[in-house]
Amino acid sequence: MAALLVPGGGAAPGLVWRRRRAAVQCAAASPSSPDPSWRTNVVSDRVSVEPSPRTIHECEADVVSGNPPAAPAAPAKAKAPPGTPVVKPLRLTSRPRRNRKSAALRDAFQETTLTPANFILPLFIHEGEEDSPIGAMPGCSRLGWRHGLIDEVYKARDVGVNSVVLFPKIPDALKSSTGDEAYNPDGLVPRAIRTLKDKFPDLVIYTDVALDPYSSDGHDGIVREDGVIMNDETVHQLCKQAVAQAEAGADVVSPSDMMDGRVGAIRTALDEAGYYHVSIMAYTAKYASAFYEPFREELDSNPRFGDKKTYQMNPENYREALLEVHADESEGADILMVKPAMPYLHVIRLLRDTSALPISAYQVSGEYSMIKAAASQGMLDEKKAILESLLCIKRAGADVILTYAALQAARWLCGEK
């Protein structure tokens, strides 16, 4: 079967991973020592059995005459180990284990399926030409926006991951108290977006809308002299940032700042600029979490003073998420997010049960790094732990997952070791 080609992007994303997955499943299903009479011809992705020289009428006549062809004997009943007590079977009307007794049955009744299409790959970018590994996040690098970024997206698409979100490391000299660099049309993020769209027209690009990477104060908003984060003035800046990203070609803008009213204001700004087609992924329930540290260290976006508790949600609160859901829905959000993911699975389920909108969840840097650290010490099986962590986020109700393990997990799902 010929590859489906996309202009500038090579084989269509997802096609390669599906082929690899099918090849692995086909190999697993093939008999290791086939009976000589079981002859197969493999042509492309089809398996055919050569017909027997005997007619159907001859075969039926044998059966009718009481001379059926030989077949394997029924398997012998397995014996219990010595010392097993002899008991009467429990009189159970239901035995749920019956539906778990084989891999085929478990697969047939599996309620949650994880695929590379469920992943959004976060990518760190900077102005340099070289890629720089991130010590606190093994397997992740700060990518040069010209070359390293392109190479990483090629790798992602090769295993079916066709969605990325960009996070910039901004030079200190470009940071200011009002974060004006955030909406520079020739800034790092707009340039990266245009470069990616030139190479991969069908790539889905998410962007981060917030001032902290651009702020000399390290906060998500403009800081008043008494330390108060100014809400409405910040929203004004965020609208300009979102429009600049949309103009560059962003598909989805993602306000992560947690300012009140920012979703509605951004929706209005995008529409007035003619970007009706650009979606908004709202960071609906973003908690003031301890799990963000590796990310903030990488982007140098830690607040220079205080913390972010006056705008991010209190980890002790649950019902408050409902207020944010209703606000974001009414203001025009297209996707709702929970961040972090694993410590807040119940909040993901709350959003899933409350809203008909798609739900995203962010497996943040601390979650990712914990698994990596434990695996490096031999405390966890890395593959099993990562895939289980992502599966439980999906099971809780997330439609898409932002995860630094997207590439690794997609390769495993493709059958690669």
Curated annotation (Swiss-Prot):
Q: Which enzyme class, named as a word?
A: lyase
Q: Where is the active site?
A: K286, K339
| Keywords (A to Z) from UniProt | Allosteric enzyme, Chlorophyll biosynthesis, Chloroplast, Heme biosynthesis, Lyase, Magnesium, Metal-binding, Plastid, Porphyrin biosynthesis, Transit peptide
Catalytic activity reported: 2 5-aminolevulinate = porphobilinogen + 2 H2O + H(+)
What Pfam families would the database entry show? ALAD
Which residues does 5-aminolevulinate 2 bind?
Answer: S365, Y404
One GO BP on record is: chlorophyll biosynthetic process
UniProt: Mg(2+) binding residues? E324
Record-listed E.C. numbers: 4.2.1.24
The record's InterPro entries line, in alphabetical order, gives: ALAD (IPR001731), ALAD_AS (IPR030656), Aldolase_TIM (IPR013785)
Q: Which cofactor does it need?
A: Mg(2+)
Localization per Swiss-Prot or TrEMBL: Plastid, Chloroplast
**Is the Amino-acid biosynthesis keyword given for this protein?**
no
| One Gene Ontology molecular-function label | zinc ion binding
On subunit structure and binding partners, the annotation says: Homooctamer.
Protein name, please? Delta-aminolevulinic acid dehydratase, chloroplastic
Write down the species.
Selaginella martensii
* Top-level taxonomy: Eukaryota, Viridiplantae, Streptophyta, Embryophyta, Tracheophyta
The encoding gene:
HEMB
